[in-house]
Amino acid sequence: MDVIQSIDLITKNTAVRGGKPCIAGTGLRVTDLVIAHLFHKRSAEELTADYELSLSQVYAALAYYYQHKDDLDKDIRHQVLNARMIKERTVSIQH
């Protein structure tokens, strides 16, 4: 009989980051790491240094992302749109 093991490195708590999946013990969202990895081309090793995480935490976040890709891609699109709107508002205020 197979026993499925899970690694408890990803948590969701409504009191932390609105219940978005985070690396346990941090406020760092899984999507924050994914954006750095996919869009900014940061390697897993670079992410450990950038965010002071263990390699297992980084790979757990990436594994979680690929397991929940559709939902997290929606979150990422929403974050990108919000960032663009904030940037546009900031630029228009400065001019």
Stretch-by-stretch model annotation:
Residues D8-L28:
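Short, Lys/Arg-enriched anionic-surface-contact patches
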Residues G27-K41:
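Short, amphipathic alpha-helical "recognition" segments used to contact nucleic acids or chromatin
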Residues D2-I4, L9-I10, V16, L38-F39, ...:
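Long, charge-rich, low-complexity intrinsically disordered regions
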Residues I23-G25, E52-L55:
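Structural motif
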